[in-house]
């Protein structure tokens, strides 16, 4: 391996929203069978990677609410890559956090994918994409999506990916109460307790749902033409149990130029979609005081056509 002293890499790690989230059943491995459309947005964390000569993974961040120890997905990703390749390379990693934690925007999953990609380049490993996908899948269900990102169909527990070709340029307003976070595991457990009677076990029926999303998923995202409702099965649970999510959805639904609205992932972040970023910015400017008075953080962004990207 060549001398890499002083080498530094900076990566943009994007958030995602769910444009479709359907819980189909329960798998033998304990995970849920899902049919989803995931879309990256241009709300980014930034990760800086630099070689250290101590053979250690050292993580620092500007976010004081984040664990920086071995249970952090960034550290887990780095250690898994080292174990897989039987190497003892070290790295100093700094995370500049913009994506809210526990928000349904998959910031942690995105950071994990960024770590695999960033260290692969930093350490000059030349690990192929198939291996990166395999490692990502080991770490978490959402993580493989971020390797290529953009907009994708996601099946299985989220690791079976099919790229969609779209040129959507919608604007997005995100709304989240900073004092509220939601456990993904608890949300799925609650959903299972309430709706497991609807679960499918027949493979052919599951494949029919996948095919329907393949055939119609992209067409159903023309919100400006059809004003379609976004399906998120988990919203049924979170909205019922969390008044702030219910209120956020109501506030977004009343925005004058809102095309559609939903909760992202397991929440609690909610979002509204507008025909373009300019319209979204105008709506946020007009309603920023209302959101602030009611205790919500708000962001405006747009769809992002890529996943992890180098700066």
From Swiss-Prot:
GO biological process, one term: terpenoid biosynthetic process
Pathway: Isoprenoid biosynthesis; isopentenyl diphosphate biosynthesis via DXP pathway; isopentenyl diphosphate from 1-deoxy-D-xylulose 5-phosphate: step 3/6
UniProt keyword list: ATP-binding, Isoprene biosynthesis, Kinase, Nucleotide-binding, Transferase
Entry EC number(s): 2.7.1.148
Residues annotated as catalytic: 16, 142
Broadest EC class assigned to this enzyme: transferase
Keyword Nucleus: no
Residues given in the record as ATP binding sites: 100-110
Single GO MF descriptor: ATP binding
Reaction catalysis annotation: 4-CDP-2-C-methyl-D-erythritol + ATP = 4-CDP-2-C-methyl-D-erythritol 2-phosphate + ADP + H(+)
Gene3D superfamilies the record matches: 3.30.230.10, GHMP kinase, C-terminal domain
Family matches, as InterPro entries: GHMP_kinase_C_dom, GHMP_kinase_C_sf, GHMP_kinase_N_dom, IspE, Ribosomal_Su5_D2-typ_SF, Ribsml_uS5_D2-typ_fold_subgr
Alphabetized HAMAP family for the sequence: IspE
Its biological purpose: Catalyzes the phosphorylation of the position 2 hydroxy group of 4-diphosphocytidyl-2C-methyl-D-erythritol.
UniProt similarity note: Belongs to the GHMP kinase family. IspE subfamily.
PANTHER family per record: 4-DIPHOSPHOCYTIDYL-2-C-METHYL-D-ERYTHRITOL KINASE, CHLOROPLASTIC
UniProt protein name: 4-diphosphocytidyl-2-C-methyl-D-erythritol kinase
Gene name tied to this protein: ispE
């Amino acid at each position: 391996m060549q001398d890499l002293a002083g080498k530094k890499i900076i990566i943009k790690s994007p958030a995602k929203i769910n444009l479709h989230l359907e819980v189909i059943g329960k798998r033998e491995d304990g995970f849920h069978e899902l049919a989803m459309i995931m879309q990256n947005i241009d709300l980014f964390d930034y990760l800086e990677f630099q070689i250290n000569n101590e053979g250690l993974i050292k993580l620092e961040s500007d976010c004081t609410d984040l664990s920086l120890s071995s249970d952090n997905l960034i550290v887990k990703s780095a250690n898994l890559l080292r174990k897989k390749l039987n190497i003892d390379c070290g790295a100093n990693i700094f995370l500049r956090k913009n994506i809210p934690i526990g928000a349904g925007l998959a910031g942690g999953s995105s950071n994990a994918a960024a770590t695999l990609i960033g260290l692969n380049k930093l350490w000059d490993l030349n690990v192929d994409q198939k291996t990166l996908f395999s490692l990502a899948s080991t770490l978490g269900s959402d993580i493989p999506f971020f390797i290529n990102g953009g907009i994708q169909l996601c099946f299985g527990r989220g690791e079976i990916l099919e790229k969609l070709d779209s040129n959507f340029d919608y604007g997005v307003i995100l709304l989240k109460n900073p004092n509220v976070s939601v456990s993904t595991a608890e949300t799925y457990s609650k959903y299972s307790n309430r709706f497991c009677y609807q679960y499918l076990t027949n493979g052919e029926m599951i494949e029919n749902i996948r095919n329907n999303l393949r055939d119609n998923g992209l067409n159903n995202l023309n919100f400006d033409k059809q004003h379609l409702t976004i399906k998120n099965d988990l919203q049924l649970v979170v909205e019922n149990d969390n008044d702030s999510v219910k209120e956020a959805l109501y506030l977004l639904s009343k925005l004058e130029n809102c095309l559609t609205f939903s909760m992202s992932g397991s929440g609690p972040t909610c979002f509204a979609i507008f025909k373009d970023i300019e319209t979204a910015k105008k709506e946020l400017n007009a309603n920023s005081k209302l959101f602030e008075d009611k205790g919500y953080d708000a962001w405006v962004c747009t769809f992002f056509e890529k996943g992890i990207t180098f700066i």
